[in-house]
Structure formats: structure tokens, C-alpha cells
A protein has these predicted regions:
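A short core secondary-structure module
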Residues: 146-147, 151-196
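A short, Trp-centered hydrophobic/proline-enriched beta-strand micro-motif
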Residues: 117-125, 169
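Flexible, small-/acidic-enriched active-site or ligand-binding loops
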Residues: 136, 190-219
Length: 382
């Protein structure tokens, strides 16, 4: 067993760390305060190959592995969680299904521009009545001639207000449940009958837009179908597995930011005539944060390695996602505690980490659903 990263992985991680420290971190607070979409950062990430880390080079990706992707996403998210989730969605939720199930023509047309950072992608699954029960979709796609006519509303779609392309999950027949689910690639800027609805006001990830997508007799070419009819639910689950690795990496980055900020602050904050870092109560908090975050990163790297080697990674991705997000939330809370009253103030980054961390326990499947996934794999239930 070799825990050492390759020279390429070390080089990429260091490159992303330097870029994130110098270009992203200095504007993270401003992005959070103004809710501004970091378009310039997204373009730069694309130019560096970080919007399609594991996408082959022939589709304008970096052609690297998923282990490298995890390392890169941790560093981006450590600097700015909003930038992290934007990169995660482009790489995983949007990029994975198009890469895995798209035709050659679809990959050239719809994957390459996103992987290269020219435009952004999103994945539209969630509906008001279809959250954890992902098979309960009501968004309807009816085939008429050479087009699908789509009607329905998608909610809480990350980057939905800025994305050019979207992988849309819809049903062709609500009575047939998961068997009727399909995935369509939609050009959101060139689809009659589509419009962006409400852009949500959120607790955290304030520089990442979360929007409602409304389809009213929207026309989508039938050639934009991913795979074949009846394969959509399986594609969806496979894409969510990949997405969970990305969200786990995002969580790990947030947790590491909380830890590093807490370490620095505890060295500088003087109480009772000495730095609070010398107090055992603070030391124990820092030690627990570091230990749990290290364990989470190792779990994520294992899941990514399994994916790279075409092995089943469903259980490991679920484990890594829920553990990483739980310990990130704990680290963020402890970070605020170590900062004391200052941690509650927007002048310091601790409160932002806590707001950003919470969603990682919820999206890409709640952590309760992750435990169901793990338990079913252990027991042998489908």
C-alpha cells in the first residue's frame, strides 16, 4: 500500500494551493458579502484544467485522475467554498454523466466547453416533491417527433442561474416510477420555453447561485438524450456517487480552512498573559479537528482511487461524503468557539466557514440517506 502521491499529483496540488491562496482567498470575503458570481475565477480554473480534471484532453479536460481531482478541490474549497462547489458541479454532477454516457458528438458539443471553462454546467434533479426520494420526479418529458417537450420546475439547482448547459432529469411517465426517468442535455441559453425562476437567498455559499429552473413546453432535441430511454435512473445514481466524492472534498476544504484559521488565531490571541494555544482545552479541540479531517481526506482518496480503477465505489463515496461533511461541520463550529466572540463576527472568516459547511451535510443526498446507502450495501439490499 502506497500512500505517497505521484509527482504529478503533488505538482498539481501545489499549483492549485498557490493559485487559491493568491487569487481566490483574498476575494472570498468580498464574494460572500456581495453574492457575486466569481466568473473570472471560473475562467481561470478552466484554463488550468480544473473544470474538467478527469475529463480526457480531447474534450478540453486535464486528462488526470479522480485522486488528483479530490486534492485540487480541497485546495479550492479551502480558499472559497463557493468556488469549490462551482468546480465540483462542473466536474462531477454535470461532467461525469456527459463523459460516462454521452455520445462522441455530445461530448464534443456539451462537455468540451464546460471542461475548458468557456461556459458552466449544472445538474437539474431536485424538485419540491423529489428531494431524497429522487425517483418521485414530476418534471415531464414527452417525445414528439424529433423533440422532447419538457414541463416542470426544478429547485435548488447549483449554478442554474449562470449555466449554459444542464443535464436535466425528467420522467416520460410518472406511473412507471424510476423506470421512466431519462436525462437530457439542455442548452439553457437556446431553449424555447425555458426560463430561470427564483434565485434563492441562502445561509452560505453566497457566491454560488442556487436557482429555480422552469420548463413550460420547452423543446429539447431528442438527440440530446443521454444513453437510451430507461437508463436515466441508473445514470443518476452513478452520477450522484461521483458527486458525493466532490462534495466530500469541498467539505474537507472548508474544515481545513476552519482548522488553519483556528490554529493561527490561537497562537495570536492572548488571554491570562499567554496565547490560548497553550491551553489544553484549545489544544484538544485542534487535535480532534486535525485527526478527523485527516481521516476524512483518506476516505475520500480511497473512494476516488476505486473510481479511477473502475471498481465499485458507491459505499465508499457515501461513507466519505457523510463523514467528511460531519467532521467539517464540527471543525467549523469548533473554529467559531476558538475565536470566541470574534468568531461570531463577519470581520473574521470563522462564521463563514460554519455557514458554508452546513450544506455539505444536506446536498448530494442528506447524510441520513448516505447511511441508508451504506447500510443497504452491507446488508445486501437494493
Amino acid at each position: 500500500m502506497n500512500f505517497a502521491p505521484t509527482e504529478e499529483q503533488k505538482m498539481v496540488r501545489e499549483m492549485v494551493r498557490k493559485f487559491s491562496e493568491t487569487q481566490i482567498k483574498p476575494i472570498a470575503a468580498e464574494l460572500d458579502r456581495t453574492h457575486r458570481h466569481p466568473e473570472e475565477i471560473c475562467r481561470q480554473l478552466g484554463e488550468m484544467g480544473l473544470m474538467g480534471v478527469a475529463v480526457p484532453t480531447e474534450y478540453d479536460g486535464a486528462g488526470m485522475d479522480n485522486v488528483t481531482y479530490v486534492m485540487a478541490l480541497i485546495e479550492i474549497s479551502k480558499a472559497c467554498a463557493s468556488c469549490g462547489v462551482i468546480a465540483s458541479v462542473n466536474n462531477s454532477l454535470y461532467g461525469y454523466p456527459v463523459k460516462a454516457f454521452g455520445t462522441e458528438e455530445q461530448k464534443k458539443k456539451f462537455l468540451a466547453p464546460v471542461a475548458g471553462g468557456k461556459v458552466e454546467g449544472c445538474y437539474a434533479l431536485t424538485e419540491s416533491s423529489a428531494g431524497s426520494d429522487a425517483a418521485a420526479l414530476k418534471c415531464r418529458a414527452e417525445l414528439k417527433g424529433d423533440r422532447y417537450i419538457v414541463n416542470g420546475v426544478k429547485t435548488f439547482i447549483t449554478s442554474g442561474n449562470v449555466a449554459r448547459y444542464c443535464v436535466l432529469a425528467a420522467t416520460t411517465d410518472t406511473a412507471r416510477g424510476y423506470k421512466a426517468i431519462i436525462n437530457l442535455i439542455v442548452d439553457l441559453k437556446n431553449t424555447p420555453g425555458f426560463r430561470v425562476g427564483k434565485v434563492e437567498e441562502k445561509m452560505g455559499l453566497l457566491a454560488s447561485g442556487t436557482a429555480e429552473l422552469i420548463f413550460e413546453d420547452a423543446e429539447v432535441p431528442a438527440e440530446n438524450l443521454l444513453g437510451k430511454p430507461g437508463q436515466g435512473f441508473k445514470q443518476m445514481l452513478s452520477g450522484l456517487d461521483a458527486g458525493r466524492i466532490g462534495i466530500g472534498a469541498q467539505a474537507c476544504g472548508i474544515g481545513r480552512a476552519a482548522l488553519e484559521d483556528a490554529v493561527e488565531y490561537s497562537r495570536e490571541r492572548i488571554q491570562f498573559g499567554k496565547p490560548i494555544a497553550t491551553f489544553q482545552a484549545i489544544q484538544f479541540k485542534l487535535a480532534d479537528m486535525a485527526t478527523e479531517l485527516d481521516a476524512a481526506e483518506l476516505m475520500l482518496l480511497r473512494a476516488a482511487w476505486l473510481e479511477d480503477n473502475d471498481l465499485d465505489f458507491e459505499k465508499e463515496a457515501a461513507m466519505a461524503k457523510y463523514y467528511a461533511s460531519d467532521v467539517a461541520m464540527k471543525a467549523a463550529i469548533e473554529g467559531v468557539q476558538i475565536f470566541g466572540g470574534n468568531g461570531y463576527m463577519k470581520e473574521y472568516p470563522a462564521e463563514r466557514h460554519m455557514r458554508d459547511a452546513k450544506i455539505c451535510q444536506i446536498y448530494e443526498g442528506t447524510n441520513e440517506i448516505q447511511r441508508v446507502v451504506v447500510a443497504r450495501k452491507l446488508i445486501g439490499l437494493r
